[in-house]
Amino acid sequence: MTSIIKLKVFSGAKDEGPLCYLLQVDGDYILLDCGWDERFGLQYFEELKPFIPKISAVLISHPDPLHLGGLPYLVSKCGLTAPVYATVPVYKMGQMFIYDMVYSHLDVEEFEHYTLDDVDTAFEKVEQVKYNQTVVLKGDSGVHFTALPAGHMLGGSIWRICRVTGEDIVYCVDFNHKKERHLNGCSFDNFNRPHLLITGAHHISLPQMRRKDRDEQLVTKILRTVRQKGDCMIVIDTAGRVLELAHLLDQLWSNADAGLSTYNLVMMSHVASSVVQFAKSQLEWMNEKLFKYDSSSARYNPFTLKHVTLCHSHQELMRVRSPKVVLCSSQDMESGFSRELFLDWCSDPRNGVILTARPASFTLAAKLVNMAERANDGVLKHEDRLISLVVKKRVALEGEELLEYKRRKAERDAEETRLRMERARRQAQANESDDSDDDDIAAPIVPRHSEKDFRSFDGSENDAHTFDIMAKWDNQQKASFFKTTKKSFPMFPYIEEKVKWDDYGEVIKPEDYTVISKIDLRKGQNKDEPVVVKKREEEEEVYNPNDHVEEMPTKCVEFKNRVEVSCRIEFIEYEGISDGESTKKLLAGLLPRQIIVVHGSRDDTRDLVAYFADSGFDTTMLKAPEAGALVDASVESFIYQVALSDALLADIQFKEVSEGNSLAWIDARVMEKEAIDNMLAVGTSNLMIDDKNREEDVNDQEENGATEGEGNAEPMEIGENGSQESLAISESGKEVENGHTNDSRTKKGTKGKIRGNLILDPLPKRLIPIHQAVFVNDPKLSDFKNLLTDKGYKAEFLSGTLLINGGNCSIRRNDTGVFQMEGAFTKDYYKLRRLFYDQFAVL
């Protein structure tokens, strides 16, 4: 493994916050998820901004806000332009998640982080992929990645990132190996000992119930609530795990023996109808056992949800009679309908709230889960049911605030009207200037009074005006300097409209293409349509004030309220994540070379790390970073990228090893680009001076007889490996030979710091060490025997030894894999040896 692999953790390490990691593979930067939670912290976005121009791709694993909630912010506010890759369901359901989150906040406060238009712009950058589809990263790095099923949410993915060298990097967080009603479980059969495994420890230490017991408990809790004339709220997400529960409850309502058909089942979110519609069109991403056929052999869509009523507002929910069961978003209860309904229903002891997941500890849902667990243990006190909440509402303006709003609105409307009229005036002036040429050509027709008295049939005078086409024609003729041979006669006035053009051609007028149907004036309708007798109310268009309802001015208020939770609180886990014991066994079975544990509380992370350590895993290859840490996952500790200089490329002699692969032996030294530029900038003048000085030194040595003795010659220093040491570069950019430098302040043997822009430059010929020949290839003796036969030699095998020409020469391979050739020193021997050498690439 010679790749540079690093992981920068921005968020989602040793906590339950959103997930965001930056993976570096050589020169490519891949962003793994970009989530956001209800706190909307901007700290990790500020840390990520310097890396955004370097990002080559963004990989999204799941559609919920914890995995992609920050994508619109990165695109709209941080300038992210890299392509985003996600599966088709993650693309569609991810939009539903973000839409619902934005609408939920706009209902109670001003949400300024991004708008719905920003959401649409961000998702336009998403490139949709399918499972097992290989996507090659743009560029020549050879990095490609594949999405595999995660089993947690519809379209959820485990990403496998590969290089051309074959090493795998697996990013798997929030996966489920168990098959559910609407999803298949994940599978790790396609992974063959990855080089790096990036995994999560989310809730790995918490026990899970059996699926059958969990479903029975859910039905029991619902029945106990609705039979007491209470309403039951099931807190669930927007477009992920809600599909599992909606399908389960729809089946229960279809079963008459369950006793639930007399009650109403509601699915409530701002995008409920869109979520169900998308689910109907994505059956190929679901469990194959989900498909059923009725008696007519027609395919039945399992997400028709005949017993589920879709609601998008409180007004629609109020029309559904109680008792009712409501699947309500959002899951953490920090915003959305779940928080609003809880404030309305928590004071009634007949109502019930069922929580299905463990969100972050700062949320309202986490407090209620803790309350439910304490109630089951019998240690919940009355004062524990009192909780303080921040209530946010949007209320209508009244009194002075309403008058002030109307005054400002009138000023804005007046200003907009003035600007609109000004634009219209300027446009009219522009049109008049365009038609000025036509006005000069057309002859004006001047109205005048008739010289005669016109009388009507009843003898009365009529002072009506008349238009004489010949009036003042002679006066309107323009004098011309040149004599005209053809007389021009007056015509009826016609001003040809100037055709307007833009960058795309002639401007199209929609009214020119309007199809006018034949109208029967007696009936007032089309002839092709049948005559229908309508009531008077239907024929006349009566203005309905509800058709143009003016949006009422509102303001956002926020206050603290202490509420008593009198309703029943239950927790039934429907999170869809593998249990801790199964997760540990699955991850250990992958036999990864390195593991980075993220996305989990400190206790869960410590538990998973301890399991790997107890299993005999190398603890030096096991990392559990903090948020903001940089993890180096490269095998070699010191790997640097260098470029080949033009001088070195000119001297390299490649030898083909196999088809498309060539090798070459190089003798070079590592230098900084600035040092080479300085050497080239010196020019030939310094070279001439050096040559002159060298000649003078040689002459002086000859005169002094220094060349005859060897006592003054310094011995050549030999490296530890027996070869002569090459040149290095000191911190100041000067050449250092064998640990010495011209700068007396530099100590012998001190290594310079490695900087960027490193270049391999040819080693001077006097410093090139002698190396033994290297034979590259692994030929087969059977293939060489066929070659000898084609050349006219007699060759045969005897006990694994290739005998040539009756044993005059033999070639065999010993136990260590080394070829041995024996024979008499004849011309044939040297020919055979040369022929055998040709099977290798000799460097």
From Swiss-Prot:
InterPro entries: Beta_Casp (IPR022712), CPSF2 (IPR027075), Cpsf2_C (IPR025069), CPSF2_MBL (IPR035639), Metallo-B-lactamas (IPR001279), RibonucZ/Hydroxyglut_hydro (IPR036866), RMMBL (IPR011108). GO terms for cellular component: mRNA cleavage and polyadenylation specificity factor complex. SUPFAM superfamilies: Metallo-hydrolase/oxidoreductase. One of its GO terms (molecular function) is RNA binding. Its main location: nucleus. PANTHER family: CLEAVAGE AND POLYADENYLATION SPECIFICITY FACTOR SUBUNIT 2 (PTHR45922:SF1). CPSF plays a key role in pre-mRNA 3'-end formation, recognizing the AAUAAA signal sequence and interacting with poly(A)polymerase and other factors to bring about cleavage and poly(A) addition. This is Probable cleavage and polyadenylation specificity factor subunit 2. It comes from Caenorhabditis elegans.
